[in-house]
Amino acid sequence: MDALTWITAGSLAAWVWLLFGQGLFWRTDVRLPPRVPPGQWPSVAIVVPARDEAEALRSSLPSLLAQDYPGRAEIFLVDDGSTDGTGELARALAEEHGGLSLTVDSPGEPQPGWTGKLWAVRHGMALARARTDAQYYLLTDADIAHAPDSLRELVSAAWSGELDLVSQMARLRVAAFWERLIVPAFVYFFAQLYPFRRINRPGARTTAAAGGCVLLRREAAERAGVPERIRGAVIDDVALARAVRRAGGRIWLGLADRVHSVRPYPGLGPLWRMVSRSAYAQLRHRPLVMAGTVAGLAVVYLVPPVAVVAGALTGDVVPLVAGAAAWAVMAGTFVPMLRYYRQPPALAVVLPFTALLYLLMTVDSAVQHYRGRGAAWKGRTYARPEAAP
């Protein structure tokens, strides 16, 4: 057999393993676990770091103010050096909509070694400790909107399962062409890297969270020493989950039904920056890991369609059949995520093209890192950030 046949056979074998051996990552049925309401509702501090988020807050903050929570809950919005009137708008929205109590404050510029977001989270948690007796923190991004019962259901899940961290991957916006092409694949690749079922096993080595929506027990945060212990992490959600688990905490991660992002990504550029800003940090800035990742993406996602085309042109049946089988398994595993995002299953066929884009984003992330522009976000650049300690 020639080289293409061998490589295609390897790709097919990889897909058979991914289908059964990677924690059934492709299934989308991991939602909040069975839960019952606590006898006495614990108090919660909702911490929202925000930097130039005025546009998103118009849709997201009213949903937090309107939380139907039987216990005490307060919102601490940390204005991280915004220039678009984020803090002023937040106060105006609170006055207009009423609901939960809102405190808006600013921590000043981050100290050396801190990322801006974690510096803001630190400030919000400190305010909550000083002003409330909160037993839980809800850490949620400024672009994340919550259904009225979101907080109640998160707390019920944590209470029922004796969980220290409950995280939901918010349903991202899918409306524009590039959003439909990129976003479902983004969540699919995340689940492939961090299979939810595997993460949710007590004591599992695989650990992650989704930073847009994290309910964290205060005692667990103090035991884990967060956010101080992860102050330089760009991939802060994964770092947070690892710190909590290392300290003996129990975590849960799944897909959201009541939480969604309001942030639009109307073109390829914003989506590209979202992925590339942290892709190389995820690989811990190691060139050999980068090379292996690129090679793996090529073999797993790009070889099947190449083998089909080459086999059809040359009349070589073996790579054609093996490539078609690998491509079919690939597409089949992507269909549940497309359905979760209410997209046509036919889009699964173009997953190799989307994977190629992600490969290029990863390469670009490394290039920007070595140019001193790694992890650029919201006007800040972290030349050599930590990934997830």
Regions found by a protein language model. Give the residues of each.
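Short, acidic, metal-binding catalytic loop of nucleotide-sugar glycosyltransferases
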Residues: 62-72
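Acidic donor-binding/catalytic loop of UDP-sugar-dependent glycosyltransferases
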Residues: 85, 140-157
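Cell-envelope/extracellular polymer assembly enzymes that use nucleotide-activated donors
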Residues: 42-45, 74
